[in-house]
Amino acid sequence: MIRNSMKSHTELLSWNLLQKEADRVRLNSDSLTCVVPDSNNYESSKQINCIEYDYSRQRVNRTIIDLLIDLANEVKLQEKIDNLINGKKINISENRPALHTALRDLGNKSIMIDGLDIMSAVINTREKIKVISNQIREKKWLGHSGLPITDIVNIGIGGSDLGPRVCINALSNYISKEFNYHFISDVDPASFNDVIAKINPQTTLFIVSSKSFTTKETLLNARKAFALYEDTASIDQHFIAVTAHPERAYQMGIKTVLPIWDWVGGRFSFCSAVNLITAIAIGYEQFVELLAGAHDVDTHVQFTDFKNNIPVLMALIGIWNNNFLNIHNLLILTYSKKLEYFVPYVQQLDMESNGKSIDVNGSMVDYATGPIVWGGLGNQAQHSYFQLLCQGTHRCVGDFITLKTNDEHEINSMCHYKMKVLSEGIQTIENPYGYIPGNMPMNHLILSDCSPYTLGALVALYEHKIFVQSVIWNINPFDQPGIESAKSAHREITLSSES
């Protein structure tokens, strides 16, 4: 039974002051500019190494930013960030930490869980990733027939698929062209057959990733891949499992197993052995750069004051749009083909984490939580949903992501034009059908490049933004009870239909 809320966050002083500011903003909704006028000038652009964050087109001013930071302080955000990174059991429904940040901690500090230092296991696993990736890249990992590996197939779904897929696509300038990279995540036979038609099983390595090693889709595809080989002896050099339950992988017949741990959520496993295919593709040294980019954002979010803290500002401005301006969907547009899979990755990360209506006390919330996340390649939006953005009745918030490189000049120009039109509108046109109201709040993230370091930083930035918002909403971003409940119902229906 869901309990009534003890004290809602809507009763906080800062929340009520923000509501009054939102009422004032709505009275001035015809303003041509997204930024609310304010006598106190403030810097609306922040930088962390390889990423510049520009929120000058958001409907905020210094007063609103200060109140949002007051809200963060009222809910003890700094303490919650420290608890996350220091390994406190913040995943309260499962009574465990959420220590994905430990996976990319390249320092020498100890992180204790129930009296055990987990960093020794993390470092040991990194060493295994290094050895395996080097052996494959140096043609020393041979298949059963004695031939070197030419194709790597990643079998997984959700976080075990989307993160690696983002990397292989985004880091195309870094990956070895001596290998072919494939992904199977779907139970649709066509997906499996399309990949199998392109490979030689004798020179193929399958990476089977499943935290529980009970994921139906993943195990079905793994068994179909097993059937490509004559017997269990011939599969030893062709399969690697990544799981928190190695005994299940061994039982299935896979002898080489890399661990993931119950304190790492599947959708937060980007920096784990789940991304082994990326370490093989770009080499271990560049894989460490990926970890370093994420780790530097971890340090930034923990030790930077909130006024200059990019993930915190992104989260708080997102709260402002979602809970006070009542804009409940987030459009993410990436202006580089390399980032084609970034939007589905964030879509899962955000909506599975914060798509909750029950708070950490087991009470129904009385405010909006996670937004609907959608989007894709920005240059394709012109010919699909740009019309709705210009003149539709649904309001959106936008994250526009561009690369600051010479070969992206033309596509970046298209991005700037769209941001200008959507934020400022077109009001001085004689044809009334051409009227565009504008006033779309938006962020602009400018990446210095699309390197492993920058990609790691970008992923960590969104991870922390999502966590910060969960703190404000008082929900647990590290479980998925709705999914588990639906799975149980599906099993019951299946058993009932079979009886």
Swiss-Prot record:
**Which enzyme class, named as a word?**
isomerase
Q: What is its EC number?
A: 5.3.1.9
Q: Which GO terms describe its molecular function?
A: carbohydrate derivative binding; glucose-6-phosphate isomerase activity; monosaccharide binding
Main localization category = cytoplasm
- Compartment(s) where it occurs, according to its Swiss-Prot or TrEMBL record: Cytoplasm
| GO annotation terms (biological process) | gluconeogenesis; glucose 6-phosphate metabolic process; glycolytic process
Biological or metabolic pathway of the protein? Carbohydrate biosynthesis; gluconeogenesis; Carbohydrate degradation; glycolysis; D-glyceraldehyde 3-phosphate and glycerone phosphate from D-glucose: step 2/4
GO CC terms? cytosol
Catalytic center residues: E352, H383, K487
Catalytic activities: alpha-D-glucose 6-phosphate = beta-D-fructose 6-phosphate
Annotated SUPFAM superfamilies = SIS domain
Q: Which UniProt keywords apply?
A: Cytoplasm, Gluconeogenesis, Glycolysis, Isomerase
Q: Does the keyword Lyase apply?
A: no
> Which Gene3D superfamilies did the record assign?
Glucose-6-phosphate isomerase like protein, domain 1 (3.40.50.10490)
Does the record's keyword annotation contain Isomerase? yes
Q: What does this protein do?
A: Catalyzes the reversible isomerization of glucose-6-phosphate to fructose-6-phosphate.
The text of the family note is: Belongs to the GPI family.
In terms of PANTHER family, this protein maps to: GLUCOSE-6-PHOSPHATE ISOMERASE (PTHR11469:SF1)
Question: Could you identify this protein by its name?
Answer: Glucose-6-phosphate isomerase
